[in-house]
From Swiss-Prot:
A Gene Ontology term for the protein's cellular component: extracellular space
SUPFAM superfamilies associated with the record: 4-helical cytokines
Cellular compartment(s): Secreted
The name this protein goes by in its record: Somatotropin
Gene Ontology MF: a single term: growth hormone activity
Disulfide bonds: C69-C177, C194-C202
One BP term from GO: positive regulation of growth
Signal peptide start and end residues: 1-17
Organism from which the protein derives: Seriola quinqueradiata (Five-ray yellowtail)
InterPro entries (alphabetical): 4_helix_cytokine-like_core (IPR009079), Somatotropin (IPR034975), Somatotropin/Prolactin (IPR001400), Somatotropin_CS (IPR018116)
């Protein structure tokens, strides 16, 4: 709880007009948070994969590559070039929606309850931080639309009692999509932070 209060008190500085160094500091906090979440996602995925037979891993990976994540409905840059051309506000907007899309879904992740229980509060922290960064970076030329305008429905089989191969596939899909989305958010926030430094090389 203390960590959340500290984050909010620090990030709230961004709501007022501050020098570029303050904005960079706020972004540094957000980037640190998403790096931690991405690491947790990788560990959960690795833990789950370690319980599978080699052939099961191969088949599930093949299926996943042909399937879609729920968050694919969120319009985002298609490659690194488009990412680099996107505005800071756009990257923050997409990051917010990606994080928000996992607030409910993350409760169903496999791979270890000790790690999974860390994810929900950290997603909430990051979501709050990104919202404050969005407010700090809005101007008359580019206004951010309501972040709650797009609400993704949960995965279709969340409420179904699954077993065997279907349960295995759902668990693999959730973990793979979560890892993929946390990587996206880490990339977008890192580029957005870099864009505030005119002398920096933001090449991906």
């Amino acid at each position: 709880m203390d960590r959340v209060v500290l984050l909010l008190s620090v990030l709230s500085l961004g709501v007022s007009s501050q020098p570029i160094t303050d904005s960079q500091h706020l972004f540094s906090i957000a980037v640190s948070r998403i790096q931690n979440l991405h690491l947790l996602a990788q560990r959960l995925f690795s833990n789950f994969e370690s319980t599978l037979q080699t052939e099961d891993q191969r088949q599930l990976n093949k299926i996943f590559l042909q399937d879609f994540c729920n968050s694919d409905y969120i319009i985002s840059p298609i490659d690194k070039h488009e990412t680099q051309r996107s505005s800071v506000l756009k990257l923050l907007s997409i990051s917010y929606r990606l994080v928000e899309s996992w607030e409910f879904s993350s409760r169903f992740l496999s791979g270890g309850s000790a790690l999974r229980n860390q994810i929900s509060p950290r997603l909430s922290e990051l979501k709050t931080g990104i919202q404050l960064l969005i407010t700090a970076n809005q101007d008359g030329a580019e206004m951010f639309s309501d972040v709650s305008a797009l609400q993704l429905a949960p995965y279709g089989n969340f409420y179904q009692s699954l077993g065997g191969e279907e349960l295995l596939r759902r668990n693999y899909e959730l973990l793979a999509c979560f890892k993929k989305d946390m990587h996206k958010v880490e990339t977008y926030l890192t580029v957005a932070k870099c864009r505030l430094s005119p002398e920096a090389n933001c090449t991906l």
